[in-house]
Amino acid sequence: RKQFEEKWDDIKLFIEYGMLSDEKFYDRAQKFALLKDTDKKYYTLEEYKTLIEANQTDKDKNLIYIYATDAVAQYSYIEIAKSKGYDVLLMDGQLDIHFIGLLEQKLEKSRFVRVDSDIIDNLVRKNDKTEVSLDAAQRNMMTTVFKSQIPTLEKAEFMVMFEALGEQSQPVIITQNEFMRRMKDMSAMQPGMNFYGEMPDSFNLIINTEHPLSKKVIEETEKDCHAEIEPIQKEINELNDAIAKLQEASKGKKDEEIPVTEKEELRNKEKEVDSLRKKESELLTQYANKHKLVRQLVDLALLSNNMLKGEALSQFIKRSVEML
């Protein structure tokens, strides 16, 4: 067995290719094919299932295989997973993305998730997650504040999300959706999937609302911006109520049956809401530009993902020195 493990990295590509291309070969090879984890330990499929099933089975009885594609770049995510008692596979081979898809088809009630595709509590869902104690207005406000401080990255889009992850977790975490990332990886290897390859990378910027630094930003933003933002939000709510009434009044009517004055009134109110939202966004962006901690938290999350480069990295270093 030891000699086989020593040779596995050299023959892995050929074994995986055979398993992917020949059903009968898969049936034979599944008994001796090995999986390698980030601690450089090797397991057969059955051995690995036995290793993880006690701790990596979610609330829906699915067995969750957590994997990394780069042990160095994804080091922080791997360490978080290990701190939970999870084992992380290393799937960095040329055919591993396809091999993962094959195993998901063959292994009953099993899913493969990349270690950086979500927060750790969502990778292996054991119970219902803690609710975030922010209302809709607070979420909208903090979304604008954090999103305004994300530097422009080529072919990358960010969605700001909020999770209650506990005081010990990082204040801001970046994850990438498993499905879209896998589709983009496969598009690089398969003709006819250029659609996914041309799409921008989609990332989640997750704000941990229970971390002291995130709490500080939220509390200070509400305190410092309350006087300017509250009247705008109040006016937006009043306009939205009026818009809802106009839409309800025209519900079920044909376009020609709705009075021109009502159509015009609806358009004007929607324009007013857009204008007020723009004003609110500008005020919050101006505030965030002056609040060094917001940009510092965003940049730290980007840095941990090897996504902070060029001018943004230079500014981060300069800001870090100033804040010491």
What are these regions (language model features)?
Residues 1-324:
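Conserved GHKL (Bergerat-fold) ATPase module
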